[in-house]
Amino acid sequence: RISVLKEVIAKVYKTRLPNLHIYISQKDVNEYLSCLSRETKRFLYPQATILYVDPYDFGTVHIPTLRTFCEKFYCELLFNLFTSDWVRNRNNELDSRIDKVIDNPKVKINNKTELVDYMLKQLKVGRMQYSFNYEFHTETNVELYQIMYLTPKDTGLEKLKDALWDTFKGA
């Protein structure tokens, strides 16, 4: 991934687009989002941000922190939701990461569908109006994760549909 990103960034900087700024950090995702949320000018409307959150596992991203960013800024969000981690660890009393991620003791999630619905409800805030989930499975058809895409504009969904169609050759 890093080599692909470096290649893309090199091409972007070579063309010198004055209205495109790339912000990269190697901080913990929650620290990173908190830092970005404190920015007052760089990410406010009419600036458009594409936020790609690909955590190490389900317990990594604090959803209220991600929600705050989505509420405050005009952005599109690509979020990797590790549903397999949740399914595997939901009944594990020792794994408090799930509770920490959700950060709401009143919320009880009983199955994967409720988890996805809860996440969408939490992230469809601010200008976010449209969403799309795409499940990724193993060769034995076990779901590993879902890519959640949220956007303020329906044209974002159209572009995503076209990209998925091109990538997966209509399959």
Predicted regions: what they are:
Residues 33, 40-49, 56-171:
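Class I S-adenosyl-L-methionine
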